[in-house]
């Protein structure tokens, strides 16, 4: 079966038969099964990644279908959780993939055991409080993770290798307040796809053990205006970083530092959890990195 299903991928020299076997033994945690997460799950399943753990609290809605893979009107009508619908679709695409679905809000207590049990974490979220939580857990447990974000025609991604690269905290000192979401600014599907192709390519390199082939940049683009920047990040690493510095405190593993309000992208819904007001823009990251 391996030689038939993955024959074209095996022909790609950096993968080959040995690499394909590594992918089939690999395990990935995908936090968020919305726009980014659903595309990533689809690609990883087709690539033959052996085990995936999917975390998402949301349900499939009709407005999701414009930009999210895996889901259908039948899932909307049945009011299926995204994690459940994603698992069902993946098993149709590639029955050999082992899927664990978790319909739950991601917090430190329930994410930590999942992080400990996988090879890599992929960010499919739509809010920065969860991303900073992933960042803390990934660095604490020395697990590589791949950040991704998109809005409108913009997108960005960063690969974090604990102990080697700067982490997300090095680039952003505080959690951004989500002043704009896809509910207010909109989003086009190609922007989602552009982020995910970079995320999944980096993920495959890591799972193959080919970290020397990683991009090692913060990638930022605006598809609509034909703009792209790939900025070196090596100088962004901070000795006093609260997550990856010399004396880490992992602040987002502490309840009082977790953001309390989430706008659920694609739904007229706000989830309120206990407070912290902060500010951020993607342009701010780009400006900071280009000044280093």
Question: Which residues make up each language-model segment?
Answer:
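Adenine nucleotide-associated cytosolic modules
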Residues: 1-292
């Amino acid at each position: 079966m391996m030689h038939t299903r993955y024959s074209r991928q095996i022909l790609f020299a950096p993968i080959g038969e040995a690499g394909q076997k590594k992918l089939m033994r690999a395990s990935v945690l995908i936090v968020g099964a919305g726009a980014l997460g659903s595309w990533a799950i689809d690609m990883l399943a087709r690539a033959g990644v052996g085990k995936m753990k999917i975390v998402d609290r949301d349900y499939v809605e009709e407005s999701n279908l414009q930009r999210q893979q895996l889901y259908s009107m039948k899932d909307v009508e049945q009011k299926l959780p995204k994690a459940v619908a994603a698992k069902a679709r993946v098993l149709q695409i590639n029955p050999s993939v082992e899927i664990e679905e978790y319909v739950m809000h991601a917090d430190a207590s329930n994410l930590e055991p999942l992080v400990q049990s996988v090879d890599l974490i992929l960010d499919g979220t739509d809010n920065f409080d969860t991303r900073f939580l992933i960042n803390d857990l990934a660095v604490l447990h020395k697990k590589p993770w791949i950040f991704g974000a998109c809005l409108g025609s913009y997108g960005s991604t960063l690969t974090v290798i604990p102990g080697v690269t700067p982490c997300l905290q090095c680039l952003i000192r505080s959690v951004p307040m989500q002043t704009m979401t896809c509910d207010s600014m909109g989003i086009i599907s190609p922007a989602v796809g552009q982020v995910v192709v970079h995320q999944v390519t980096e993920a495959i390199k890591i799972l193959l053990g080919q970290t020397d082939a990683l991009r090692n940049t913060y990638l930022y683009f605006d598809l609509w205006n034909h703009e792209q920047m790939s900025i070196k990040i090596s100088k962004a690493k901070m000795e006093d970083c609260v997550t990856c510095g010399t004396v880490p405190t992992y602040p987002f593993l502490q309840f009082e530092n977790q953001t309390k309000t989430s706008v659920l992208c694609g739904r007229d819904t706000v989830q309120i959890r206990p407070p912290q007001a902060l500010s951020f823009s993607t342009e701010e990251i780009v400006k900071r990195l280009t000044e280093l």
